[in-house]
């Protein structure tokens, strides 16, 4: 008798194990707290790229606190908008809103409260530009991505990724009162990083998206085209990330050297996926590494502004300026 095997696609809980281990209270679950640390990391990256780094402790706390509150508000509003959609999928039907563990009214009040608190904290403790950019990020996530693009186009995350790319601008604005070249560079980097990151997850969950009619790229074009697109954006990410050497006010050489293994690993994983687009193992590995990659880039930006990194850069410049003896 022929043995029949079926491909069992992982759930989101299997892709991100922490979701399975920790059961959050309903009011906290809808705020999507697991997304906040990476957004705050890119906010810190935007600060580190500015001449105003390091910030005073009160300004730093207000910036990160306001950003966390704005992100929480965006998460709640996203859950409110998609509660009917979540209720139609087995994977998400147990979430707080579709399961009835939290009422829509309570969630909406919480979202408004977080939005107002974020605005007040950023205006009073940072500046109006940082507050305005933070609210722009909230609105772009809920209105541009969730409501307009996600249900209509397979390029939803390419355009809608602007929402996740705004925190570096908030960080830069908090540090100097304006958005300089470094802030815009990190904004662009997050924009081009987002498609490869999200499409890797969408490859794992494409049957869920297909079942409810969400036109994610793996659903519309299939894994081969998606893997090819991921490889393209992966290379763009690597090339653009290398320009951070010039975006940093100091410590660029340190950043450039330490970035090499991060980029090498990213290229290795996108290449593996392009060779075997149907591999769930490869898609999962890329998704997980992409998160660590962006955390790593932001950490390198911060470390590059230390005295140790500046000394390293100075030594590199001295070595490059030594006479070669060739005339």
Swiss-Prot record:
Pathway entry: Porphyrin-containing compound metabolism; heme O biosynthesis; heme O from protoheme: step 1/1
Family annotation (InterPro entries): Protohaem_IX_farnesylTrfase, UbiA_prenyltransferase, UbiA_prenylTrfase_CS, UbiA_sf
Localization, UniProt: Cell inner membrane
The protein's Enzyme Commission number: 2.5.1.141
Annotated GO biological process: heme O biosynthetic process
Major enzyme class: transferase
Coarse class of the protein's main subcellular location: membrane
Signal peptide segment: none
A GO cellular component entry from the record: plasma membrane
Alphabetical keyword list: Cell inner membrane, Cell membrane, Heme biosynthesis, Membrane, Transferase, Transmembrane, Transmembrane helix
Job description of the protein: Converts heme B (protoheme IX) to heme O by substitution of the vinyl group on carbon 2 of heme B porphyrin ring with a hydroxyethyl farnesyl side group.
Protein's name in the database: Protoheme IX farnesyltransferase
Organism: Synechococcus sp. (strain CC9605)
């Amino acid at each position: 008798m022929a043995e029949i095997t079926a491909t069992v696609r992982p759930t989101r809980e299997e892709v991100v194990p922490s979701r399975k281990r920790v059961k959050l209270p309903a009011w906290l679950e809808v705020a999507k707290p697991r997304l906040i640390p990476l957004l705050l990391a890119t906010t810190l990256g935007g600060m580190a790229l500015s001449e105003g780094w390091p910030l005073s402790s009160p300004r730093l706390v207000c910036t990160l606190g306001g950003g966390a509150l704005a992100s929480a508000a965006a998460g709640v509003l996203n859950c409110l908008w998609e509660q009917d959609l979540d209720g139609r999928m087995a994977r998400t039907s147990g979430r707080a809103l579709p399961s009835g563990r939290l009422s829509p009214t309570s969630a909406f009040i919480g979202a408004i409260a977080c939005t107002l608190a974020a605005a007040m904290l950023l205006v009073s403790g940072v500046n109006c530009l940082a507050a305005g950019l933070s609210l722009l990020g909230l609105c772009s996530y809920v209105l541009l991505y969730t409501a307009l693009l996600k249900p209509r186009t397979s390029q939803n995350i390419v355009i809608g990724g602007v929402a996740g790319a705004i925190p570096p601008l908030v960080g830069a604005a908090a540090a100097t009162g304006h958005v300089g070249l470094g802030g815009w560079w990190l904004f662009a980097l997050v924009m081009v990083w987002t498609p490869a990151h999200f499409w890797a997850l969408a490859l794992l969950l494409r049957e869920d998206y297909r079942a409810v009619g969400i036109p994610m790229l793996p659903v519309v074009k299939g894994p081969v085209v998606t893997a090819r697109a991921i490889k393209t954006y992966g290379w763009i990410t690597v090339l653009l990330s290398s320009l951070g050497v010039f975006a940093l006010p100091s410590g660029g050489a340190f950043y450039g050297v330490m970035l090499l293994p991060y980029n090498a690993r990213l290229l290795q994983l996108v290449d593996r996926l392009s060779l075997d687009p149907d591999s769930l193992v490869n898609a999962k590995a890329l998704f997980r590494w992409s998160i660590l990659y962006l955390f790593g880039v932001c950490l390198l930006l911060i470390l590059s502004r230390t005295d140790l990194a500046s000394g390293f850069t100075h030594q590199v410049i001295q070595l490059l300026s030594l006479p070669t003896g060739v005339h």
